[in-house]
């Protein structure tokens, strides 16, 4: 249905909507994780390719990487790729480029401040992820 309705919008308007969504989505997604760039500063970085004074380089990379990751997800959807471990690792690598080593399972324990949940250690996480994808495939094939 989305693609049907999308076809009724002229290409310039559609492109404008998509560009606005990409910018707003990137800003909001990185802001919720603590990024201090404003929406206007995010626009300057992403659309004008300019850095913003007084901001950490990490924050610049976060918004640039988020935009790349969003486009990667759109590409995977357009190519009708199934969500799998490879795609998730690719996304992690894109999101963390120039920040930390990404696309691999962590080897050290982590904590979530203020949360009662303790994330699994590296090896346990690997097993849980494998089980998740097996369960996902099973649910897709079963009638629920």
Give the ranges of each region predicted by the language model:
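FIC/Doc superfamily catalytic core
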Residues: 1-144
């Amino acid at each position: 249905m989305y693609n049907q309705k999308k076809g009724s919008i002229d290409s310039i308007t559609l492109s404008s909507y998509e560009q606005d969504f990409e910018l707003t989505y990137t800003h909001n997604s990185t802001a919720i994780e603590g990024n201090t760039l404003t929406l206007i500063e995010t626009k300057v970085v992403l659309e004008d390719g300019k850095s913003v004074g007084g901001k950490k380089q990490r924050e610049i990379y976060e918004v640039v990487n988020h935009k790349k990751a969003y486009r990667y997800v759109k590409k995977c959807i357009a190519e009708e790729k199934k969500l799998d471990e490879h795609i998730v690792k690719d996304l992690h690598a894109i999101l963390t480029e120039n920040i930390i080593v990404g696309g691999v399972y962590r080897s050290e324990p982590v904590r979530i401040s203020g949360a009662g949940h303790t994330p699994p250690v590296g090896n346990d996480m690997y097993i849980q992820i494998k089980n998740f994808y097996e369960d996902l495939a099973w649910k897709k094939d079963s009638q629920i």
